Every structure is written in C-alpha cells, then in structure tokens.
C-alpha cells in the first residue's frame, strides 16, 4: 500500500468535502490515486457535499458585481441553510467569487449541465453529426466523437464546470463542495443573470472620420 501523506488527504478533502477519515480510507483503498479515491467516495455516497445536498437551503444572499468600467454586471443567488451562515464572511466571499466568475465567463448560461434543456443537446448533436471531418468514419467511432464533443460543449455552458478564476486547479463545483465542508451546511447556486452594456441593441454605424470631423465643427 502506498504511503498516504497528510497533504494528499487534505487535497482530497478540499476537492470532495468528505471527512478526514473517509478521505484517508478512500486513498488507502485506491493505493493513493486521488482520482480513483474521488470515485470511491462517490460510489460510497459519503462525501459531505452529497450528504448535505438533500437539506433545504432557503437562506443566503443575492450578490451583485459590476466589472471595472461598468460594462458587465452580474446578479447571482447563492443559498445556504441558515441566516447565521449567510451573514458570515466565508459565505459572503464565496458569493462574491462566484459573481466575479460569472462576469468572466461570457459563454456560461446555466448553473450545471443538468439544467441545460434537452433540445440544446439535440441541436448540438445535429450540428456535430453533420461536420465534414466525420464523413466516412464508422458509425460507432462517429458516435463516440460526437458524444465527446457534446459533453465538452455542454460543460462550456455550465457554471459549475468552469475552472475557478481565483484557483485554476479547481472547478466552481469543487469550490462549492470545499465551502460546504468548511461551513457545514448545504450550499446551492440557484440562479444568475449576466448583463452586458448595449447587448441586443442594434448600434448605428457611422463613418469614424466623419464623426470626428463633426465633433471638431468641420
């Protein structure tokens, strides 16, 4: 059996939100392989995030963030179980980080992949199946390639699957799980809206030189 270091146990705990002894056992069962240890914990259903997922999270806050210059704004609702936690600095910092994350991710439209309507996945499949680079490939190979591309595209639309802007080594989902382990309550990102100044407005295009000349009174 591989030597299980405290550093490795902490890394697994940060990624999953599971307890220290559970993480140590998972690493022992998987010979120190952290990826397999995460799978082991999920199979056993003992990660703290999963344990708390069914608990009602009706408190929390609506966080706002306006990017420098005022061109991008975000509103996001982040829920927890108690008002006490909602008023704490750890939860407030989490909500602020999530709002900044949304501001930095123009492609993100949904909280998680499960929220994406099936018609969007179906449309992506239709597009991918018609690509020229798949012509002539066996159906089974084509299907695997298409499924991989669809999964990648759907993750691009999902907030929880994005690398966290403050720490690229973890995803937003892992950040939330880590916060659940720290705070000890269920935490949910319920909904968000990203605003871009002038988005959807058809702007009148003018000759730039003529505009400058007009401003100079020529």
Swiss-Prot record:
Disulfide bonds: none
Residues in coiled coil: none
GO molecular function, one term: translation elongation factor activity
Signal peptide (from-to): none
Keyword DNA-binding tagged: no
Region listing for Involved in Mg(2+) ion dislocation from EF-Tu, in residue ranges: 82-85
A cellular-component GO term for this protein: cytoplasm
Subcellular location: Cytoplasm
Keywords, alphabetical: Cytoplasm, Elongation factor, Protein biosynthesis
Family designation: Belongs to the EF-Ts family.
Physiological role: Associates with the EF-Tu.GDP complex and induces the exchange of GDP to GTP. It remains bound to the aminoacyl-tRNA.EF-Tu.GTP complex up to the GTP hydrolysis stage on the ribosome.
UniProt name for this protein: Elongation factor Ts
């Amino acid at each position: 059996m591989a030597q299980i270091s405290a550093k490795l146990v902490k890394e697994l705990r940060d990624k999953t939100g599971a307890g220290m002894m559970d993480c140590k056992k998972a690493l022992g069962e998987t010979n120190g392989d952290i990826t397999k240890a995460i799978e082991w914990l999920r199979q056993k259903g003992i990660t703290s995030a999963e344990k708390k997922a069914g608990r009602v999270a009706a408190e929390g806050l609506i966080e706002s963030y306006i990017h420098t210059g005022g061109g991008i704004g975000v509103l996001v609702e982040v829920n927890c179980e108690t008002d006490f936690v909602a008023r704490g600095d750890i939860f407030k910092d989490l909500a602020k980080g999530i709002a900044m994350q949304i501001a930095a991710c123009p492609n993100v439209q949904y909280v998680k992949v499960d929220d994406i309507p099936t018609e969007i996945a179906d449309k992506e499949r239709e597009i991918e199946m018609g690509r020229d680079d798949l012509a002539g490939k066996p159906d089974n190979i084509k299907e695997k390639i298409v499924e991989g591309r669809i999964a990648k595209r759907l993750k691009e639309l999902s907030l929880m699957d994005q690398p966290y802007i403050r720490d690229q080594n973890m995803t937003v989902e892992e950040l939330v799980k880590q916060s659940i382990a720290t705070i000890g309550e269920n935490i949910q990102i319920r909904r968000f809206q990203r605003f871009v100044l002038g988005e959807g407005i058809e702007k009148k295009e003018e000759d730039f030189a003529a505009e400058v000349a007009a401003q100079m009174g020529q």
